[in-house]
Swiss-Prot record:
Broad class of the protein's primary localization: membrane
PANTHER family: SEC-INDEPENDENT PROTEIN TRANSLOCASE PROTEIN TATA (PTHR42982:SF1)
Organism this protein belongs to: Legionella pneumophila (strain Lens)
Membrane-topology annotation of the record: Single-pass membrane protein
Domain of life of the organism encoding this protein: Bacteria
Name of the molecule in the record: Sec-independent protein translocase protein TatA
GO CC terms of this entry: TAT protein transport complex
Disulphide connectivity of cysteines: none
Function: Part of the twin-arginine translocation (Tat) system that transports large folded proteins containing a characteristic twin-arginine motif in their signal peptide across membranes. TatA could form the protein-conducting channel of the Tat system.
Locations listed in the record: Cell inner membrane
Subunit-structure text: The Tat system comprises two distinct complexes: a TatABC complex, containing multiple copies of TatA, TatB and TatC subunits, and a separate TatA complex, containing only TatA subunits. Substrates initially bind to the TatABC complex, which probably triggers association of the separate TatA complex to form the active translocon.
Transmembrane segments: 2-22
Length: 61
């Protein structure tokens, strides 16, 4: 048994169906778009944390 009761053979079959439907070039595009979206999200979260700490530094005591 694999993850959540899905066997490795079932996962391979699902992967083969996805590749057959979309093709490898479309999957590469989807993968790179998803990676860039995650990178931009992390960058936005880091800049938000930086802005929050800068605001806290400027508060009078």
């Amino acid at each position: 048994m694999g993850l959540s009761g899905i066997s490795p053979l079932s996962l391979l079959l699902i992967l083969a169906i996805i590749v057959a439907l979309f093709g490898t070039s479309k999957l590469k595009t989807i993968g790179s778009d998803l990676g860039e979206a995650i990178k931009n999200f992390r960058k936005a979260m880091n800049s938000e944390e930086t802005n929050d700490t800068q605001k806290d530094d400027h508060k009078p005591s």
